[in-house]
UniProtKB/Swiss-Prot annotation:
Keywords: Angiogenesis, Cytoplasm, Developmental protein, Differentiation, Disulfide bond, DNA-binding, Endonuclease, Hydrolase, Nuclease, Nucleus, Protein synthesis inhibitor, Pyrrolidone carboxylic acid, Secreted, Signal, Stress response
Biological processes, Gene Ontology terms: actin filament polymerization; angiogenesis; antibacterial humoral response; antimicrobial humoral immune response mediated by antimicrobial peptide; defense response to Gram-positive bacterium; hematopoietic stem cell proliferation; innate immune response; negative regulation of apoptotic process
UniProt name for this protein: Angiogenin
Activation/inhibition comment: Has weak tRNA ribonuclease activity by itself due to partial autoinhibition by its C-terminus, which folds into a short alpha-helix that partially occludes the substrate-binding site. In absence of stress, the ribonuclease activity is inhibited by RNH1 in the cytoplasm. In response to stress, dissociates from RNH1 in the cytoplasm and associates with cytoplasmic ribosomes with vacant A-sites: ribosomes directly activate the tRNA ribonuclease activity of ANG by refolding the C-terminal alpha-helix. In response to stress, the angiogenic activity of ANG is inhibited by RNH1 in the nucleus.
GO molecular function: actin binding; copper ion binding; DNA binding; endonuclease activity; heparin binding; protein homodimerization activity; RNA nuclease activity; signaling receptor binding
Location of the active site: 37, 138
UniProt source species: Oryctolagus cuniculus (Rabbit)
Length: 149
């Protein structure tokens, strides 16, 4: 009886280690989003911050024209993908119900090749993102929070 269960246990254990390709792809797009747009605890949030972060995140070959870093915690950003902190915006996007601290880095200077120079703009904004399977996968824009009149 024990020998009969051995192959089943082996198949079960091996099955636990296999990740369906769609889940692996979703996770990689989310990780790419975090690499490009997430920085929990920024330092400075000035031009030097932008130049350092853009280089550190490999966004300078060629120099990316504009990139925004969202500050705070990952859970709050994920919540934009749900009704907890987000609502539909346009055709395929979600806009945050609450504002986030963000730093937008804009490339200044002529050449699209390193060394890249960036100008920083920081502030509190609502973010617009695309989500797949409850995870942010694309940063679209940040907008000033509209106040009710």
């Amino acid at each position: 009886m024990v020998m009969g269960l051995g192959p089943l246990v082996l198949i079960f254990v091996l099955g636990l280690g296999v990740t369906p390709p769609t889940l692996a792809q979703d996770d990689s797009r989310y990780k790419h989003f975090l690499t490009q747009h997430y920085d929990a605890k920024p330092f400075g949030r000035n031009d030097r911050y932008c130049e350092t972060m853009m280089k550190r995140r490999d966004l300078t070959s060629p120099c990316k024209d504009t990139n925004t870093f969202v500050h705070g915690n990952k859970g709050s950003i994920k919540d934009v993908c749900e009704d907890k902190n987000g609502k539909p915006y346009g055709k395929n996007f979600r806009i945050s119900k609450s504002s986030f601290q963000v730093t937008t880095c804009k490339h200044v200077g002529g050449s699209p090749w390193p060394p890249c120079r960036y100008r920083a703009t920081s502030g509190s904004r609502n973010i617009v993102i695309a989500c797949e399977n409850g995870l942010p996968v694309h940063f679209d824009e940040s907008v000033f929070q509209q106040k009710a009149h």
